[in-house]
Amino acid sequence: MSMQYKSIKVQNDMFVSIIKKNKELMMILDYISQLNLPNFYIAAGSVFQTIWNYYDKKPLNYKIKDIDIIYYDANNLSIEDENELENNIINHFSKLGMDYIFDVHNEARMHLWKKNENANINQYKNSEDAIDQWIATVHAIGITKEKDEIKVYAPYGLSDIFSRTIRPIKHKNNTKELYDKKVESWKSRFNNLNIIEW
């Protein structure tokens, strides 16, 4: 039976076991967890694409463009502090020879960032609220660490990741244009994707 048809627990256990094989992602997760960022996740591409690469028998970081790190701190909406945090993370891993693009965002201030792009959204309630509204079900995924255990947040389940099904999340803040752009990016780097049109 394909993994996409297995029980939620079996899928979650397999997902975590594969993620743990990505040693660089684990190094990043360990480091970020030590920063004590509130409500943090490593999220989106670097997470679900690790699974795809595993089944493609590719290096686990193959074609991963960046590492998305999110957290939620409503008590500090400073863009300067967010940028400083991102630069510190970049510098830390650059010294270790891990020259990824790191995108670090405080989801508590995302409504302010979107406003600068002439888009009006409500302030997210927490990091999970942000992930719930991302562009595709495979994209809406995050891993965090609690008491030395990896925890997975997957509001739409893991079946689409295992079956490589790109399914839009038709939230009012999302658009066909943004979805199609993401789909083209994934198609250019990964094969055998099952695309569900907007």
Residue ranges and their predicted role:
Residues 1-198:
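Catalytic cores of the polymerase beta-like nucleotidyltransferase superfamily
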